[in-house]
Amino acid sequence: MKHLLITLSMLTICLSCNTVRRDYERLMGSQVIFPETLQKVERQDTLPFVTNKDNAHMVIYYDSTQCNTCAVSKLGDWDSIIDDAKSIYEDIDFVFIMSPTKSDQKKVMRDIGINYSDYNVAFDDSGAFSQSNPQIPQDNRFHTMLLDKNNNVVLIGNPLYSNSIWELMKEALMNIKNNNGQFVAN
């Protein structure tokens, strides 16, 4: 019985690693679509969300399985990353996409409008971002990604929680800067 449990545990770990690898390979290099139904939150109003098509984008996506009100309260944590990234490549936009549950939508909208309207927050009340980008896994480790100006994923990972991701992001930004907004693999 003990050997069976060990074998099953090892099999589960191996399958999990294969899933993560497959999710990574499916997302890396794919093109991300910003659906027209996204709304920009400004104060107490919503406006159509429009991206600058000539800029690179750092997308930070919070789906309905995550605590969106918690995410809103932590937007200020991104300030130093945003400032440092823009000092490397000024043509980068940080896009925070919030897709809260129906029950949290009003609170999230209010919190963004009152406290965080200076951030580039897109509100997705219909789940259109997820539907338009089926290559993005549900695993939230894949919900922070750097896109070049063509909206191709060039880096996956959150630089807030990993110095190695931050170093890779700086290298990728230099690559994008040196190649007119496009990422060129070495």
Segments predicted by a language model, with ranges:
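N-terminal "domain-start" segment that seeds a small globular fold
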Residues: 17-52, 72-74
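Thiol-/selenol-based redox modules, centered on thioredoxin-like
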Residues: 141, 146-186
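Short acidic, S/G/P-rich loop/turn micro-motifs used as interaction or catalytic elements
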Residues: 64-69, 101-103, 160-162
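Sec-dependent bacterial lipoprotein signal peptides
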Residues: 1-17
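Structural beta-sheet core signal
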Residues: 58-60, 94-97, 146
